[in-house]
Amino acid sequence: MQEIQKITEDIYRTTLPYKDIFTTVYALKTPEGAILFDAGSYDEDAALYIKPFLEELGITEQQLKYVFISHNHTDHAGGLNGFLPLYPNVTVLTRSRKLQEQYPEYKSERTEDGQLILGTYQVVTIPGHTKDCAGLLDVRTKTLISGDCLQSYGIRGSGTWAANIIYPAEHVEAVEKVRKLDIERIVTAHDYDPHGYRADGREAVVKNLDACITPLRNMQKLILEFPELDDVALQEKYNYDPELPKVKHQVIGAMRTAMEEKRIALL
């Protein structure tokens, strides 16, 4: 049996393999039923990891009402292929119309910012990594399950996973929205440098949100300091520090475009 981590009395976490890192699913309990947050990456994840995880927590097929997909990327939504046949009565909650179209034979609903699920979990839209990124805020314990929405400096690993934010202007606005919410804990889908997968207490939450802006600010500085360099050359400069996660040149390009179109202020 894989390790299960208890976040609160009603929020539990387990990790699943993905490339040379991992991804995460969360089980969220309420008096009205349960929610699975994300669905893993691969077809076999449901049978190997997710079903045993839910069973260990005593969550039956009848009790599981929803699977909430934080965004339509493989390591979060790819496991639906194996999951939905095992839990055919669950409703998929997503911001992605494309994801809904992939599974027309199953029930799905498109979520909206501020929507309350099972009287307990509030949808918080946090675009940036993707346009459809969203998390769930437990209004009882003030715990935000953010998935990939809040990435701090990024993920260490073989990939270029540093601050993978391709909609920087929208992300800065969303982070400021989150900053104004009453949040005392953030838990994420991956270990994000430098804070890992969780921030406990208001001070740690603020530091986590500050860390989400820092890489974007550093990219801005490079673009302004070296206007003659293209995105690939700036990528090399950003990635010079071996201790930091590595950024994609497309992320720097997205920041450059936002600056040129005056959609983002100096950070």
Predicted segments with their positions:
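Conserved N-terminal boundary motif of the eukaryotic protein kinase catalytic domain
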Residues: 119-124
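Active-site HxH/HxHxD metal-binding segment of metal-dependent hydrolases
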Residues: 41-117
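Short gly/ser/thr-rich secondary-structure transition/capping motifs
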Residues: 18-19, 105-111, 125-128
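Histidine-centered active-site/metal-ligand motif
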Residues: 71-76, 129, 133, 190, ...
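Alpha-helix N-cap/loop-to-helix initiation residues
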Residues: 20-21, 43, 73-76, 194, ...
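Accessory terminal helices/loops
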Residues: 176-185, 192-267
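Conserved beta-strand hairpin/beta-sheet module of binuclear metal-dependent hydrolase folds
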Residues: 2-57, 135-147
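Metallo-beta-lactamase
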Residues: 41-43, 125-127, 131-218
